[in-house]
A protein has these predicted regions:
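Donor nucleotide-sugar binding/catalytic pocket of nucleotide-sugar-dependent glycosyltransferases
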Residues: 41, 142-204
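N-terminal subdomain of nucleotide-sugar transferases
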Residues: 1-58
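Short, hinge-like loop/turn segments at secondary-structure boundaries
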Residues: 54-58, 108-110, 130-135, 191
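Alpha-helix capping/helix-boundary segments
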Residues: 45, 97-98, 177-179
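An amphipathic, basic-hydrophobic alpha-helix
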Residues: 63-89, 94-104, 108, 155-159
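Acceptor-binding helix/loop patch of EC 2.4 sugar-transfer enzymes
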Residues: 116-155, 159
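Structural motif
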Residues: 40, 92-93, 116
Length: 205
């Protein structure tokens, strides 16, 4: 049975990174199988050759860590679009910002929400200015900075992720190591391995 799937992400082309590449490959592969896949991604306010399946939600001028656009009042925009698409499944790729929108819309429209855990988020805290400062202090042997950073990594982030993952109907781990990492979270949501695919041309040489 063919499905209508909404992919939701905080970064996408023209941004270059592992998550945008993974989303594009997955969307293309699912379309080749006959499914309809719509991508909800931030507006980078720069020229990009989008197709009719890509929806760009509004963003603010400033960016997180100089690269990730901050969504600007996007719930209404995404909700209006979803209400016209008859979506069967929401596949979200980030737990914050668009992640909150995805789970809220999924609940409101009774649409299952799945989430791919692409990133060990605690490893990227230092890209945010306050935590980058603490990381520098910790590297210099400052015990207070190290303690605060450790608390943020082990308590704040994990508690937030626990709550988010419990709102999803399924979690995909790209690797077994990520699946093993998530097991101590003790969530009721099923965690299955779904590796990131490679284009078939990679195997033709």
């Amino acid at each position: 049975e063919k499905m209508r799937i909404a992919m939701m992400t905080n970064n996408y082309k023209p941004f270059v990174g592992g998550v945008p590449i993974s989303i594009e490959r997955l969307a293309d592969s699912l379309r080749d199988l006959g499914h309809s896949v719509y991508v909800f991604a931030p507006d980078y306010k720069s020229p990009v050759d989008d197709d009719e399946y890509t929806f760009r939600f509004p963003t603010m001028k400033h960016k997180i860590a100089g690269a990730i656009p901050i969504p600007n009042l996007i719930y209404g925009y995404v909700k209006n679009a979803i209400s016209t698409l008859d979506i069967d499944l929401i596949h979200v790729h980030h737990p914050v910002m668009i992640g909150n929108v995805a789970t809220r819309i999924g609940k409101e429209f009774h649409i299952p929400v799945v989430f791919t855990y692409h990133t060990r988020y605690e490893q990227y805290l230092h890209y945010l200015t306050p935590f980058g400062y603490l990381q520098n202090k910790a590297n210099q042997g400052n015990l207070l900075g190290e303690s605060i950073l450790d608390f943020a990594q082990r308590q704040v982030i994990q508690r937030y992720l626990n709550r988010f993952l419990e709102k999803c109907d399924m979690v995909f781990a790209p690797t077994k190591s990520i699946q093993d990492y998530l097991k101590p979270f003790h969530i009721d949501t099923p965690i299955n391995i779904a590796p990131t695919g490679l284009p078939h041309v990679c195997f033709e040489k």
